[in-house]
């Protein structure tokens, strides 16, 4: 497997999709302060417990939170290792050569041809004349 293919495997897309929903981002913030159970998150966020559970499942599937049994309750905390791995993988993704990333072939080709793209030259020419 190419190094560039790891980005899809490691769940960068899944994690950012999970974080892209406002309620889930709020849950992440709440859990950054302390571990919490569904009933606590439900109270703090003023949402029904089943909805909170759905959000937590998505965050857990994206490896952003972990659950721990505490008696009758399940306590959720941030998955610090998962968040660190996400940050490291995202940094590698940003540093990777776009030509080596699967799914970026068309964009990579267009980027390499920008300097000779007539449409871009025309737009830049008009903007320079206006300034």
Regions found by a protein language model. Give the residues of each.
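Alpha-helical residues within the helix-turn-helix
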Residues: 43, 54, 60-61
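Beta-hairpin "wing" of winged helix-turn-helix
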Residues: 60-70, 77
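C-terminal regulatory/oligomerization modules of transcriptional regulators
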Residues: 1-8, 33, 61, 81-131
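N-terminal helix-turn-helix DNA-binding core of bacterial DNA-binding proteins
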Residues: 10-51, 73-83
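Compositionally biased, intrinsically disordered low-complexity segments enriched
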Residues: 36, 51-52, 56-57, 69, ...
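Alpha-helical interaction segments
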Residues: 6, 45, 63-67
């Amino acid at each position: 497997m190419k190094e560039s293919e790891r980005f899809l495997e490691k769940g960068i897309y899944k994690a950012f999709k999970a974080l892209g929903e406002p309620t889930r981002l709020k849950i992440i913030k709440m859990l950054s302060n302390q571990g919490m159970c569904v009933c606590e998150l439900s109270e703090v966020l003023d949402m029904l417990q089943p909805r909170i559970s759905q959000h937590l499942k998505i965050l857990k599937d994206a490896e952003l939170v972990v659950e721990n049994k505490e008696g009758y309750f399940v306590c959720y905390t941030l998955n610090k290792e998962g968040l660190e791995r996400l940050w490291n993988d995202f940094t590698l993704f940003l540093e990777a050569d776009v030509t080596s990333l699967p799914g970026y072939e068309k964009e990579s080709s267009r980027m390499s041809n920008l300097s000779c793209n007539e449409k871009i030259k025309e737009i830049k020419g008009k903007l320079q004349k206006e300034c």
